[in-house]
A protein has these predicted regions:
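Beta-propeller blade termini
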Residues: 76-86, 132-145
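Sec-dependent signal peptide recognition
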Residues: 2-9
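Acidic/hydrophobic-patterned starts of short beta strands in beta-sheet-rich repeat architectures
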Residues: 88-98, 142-147
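Acidic, small-residue rich beta-repeat scaffolds with periodic aromatic anchors
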Residues: 22-56, 135-190
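Repeat-based blade/solenoid architectures
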Residues: 69-80, 127-134, 183-189
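Short consensus segments that form the blades of beta-propeller domains
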Residues: 72, 100-105, 155-161
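Flexible low-complexity loop/turn motifs enriched in small/helix-breaking residues
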Residues: 19-82, 86, 91, 115
Length: 190
């Protein structure tokens, strides 16, 4: 009898310590693939994959402290936005322009694309340039195009950008990533 009581006591302690009375299930295992929130209708609260890191905006911005610095790493969505069905699934996708200012002299511009559908494209941004001047963004012939002014490699960043460039984003044949290209009139885009 004492043995049964001892075993039941140990079992009760074990179940209590291990949460045996809980009805919650264990969290599902995850892999190392980054999760990018892809809601084309709400780019102000979406994730953008830049340089191997997913930055998720909240109300169009994200501000993070920089280690060993008094400045912040700031991401901000600009007013430039276009919609179109780049992945041909019957639902519009969205392209936006966002900037990254890490407190130095540069302001880095990116084209970000948010796709609809069950399989979002993780690498959804491309670098456009540093201290450029965005003119507009549109959806043309199944591709997103962003028009901006930039400088050639010989021109100082102190001078305003004057060379018009059209950045082009299109979905690859497998519909798993974007191909980015550009065109201009002076040979910057090769």
């Amino acid at each position: 009898m004492k043995t049964k009581l001892a075993i039941l006591s140990v079992a009760a302690l074990f179940l209590t310590a291990c949460g045996g009375g809980s009805t919650e299930s264990a969290p599902e295992a995850t892999n190392d693939v980054p999760v990018v929130i892809q809601n084309p209708a709400d780019p102000a609260n979406a994730g953008f994959y830049i340089d191997g890191i997913v930055y998720t905006l909240v109300n169009g911005a994200l501000e993070q402290p920089i280690e060993d610095s008094e400045t912040n790493n700031v991401f901000k969505l600009l007013e430039f936005k276009s919609s179109g069905d780049i992945n041909a699934d019957g639902t519009d996708d969205t392209a936006v322009v966002l900037i990254n200012d890490a407190g130095g002299s540069g302001t880095f511009y990116y084209l970000g694309i948010l796709t609809s559908g069950p399989a979002p494209i993780i690498e959804n941004t491309t670098f456009l340039g540093d201290r450029i001047d965005i003119k507009g963004i549109s959806f043309v012939d199944g591709k997103f195009e962003v028009v901006y002014l930039d400088r050639d490699s010989e021109t100082s960043f102190d001078a305003p950008p004057t060379i018009e460039i059209t950045g082009i984003a299109e979905l690859d044949e497998s519909k798993t990533s974007f191909n980015f290209s550009c065109r201009d009139n002076v040979g910057i885009c090769l």
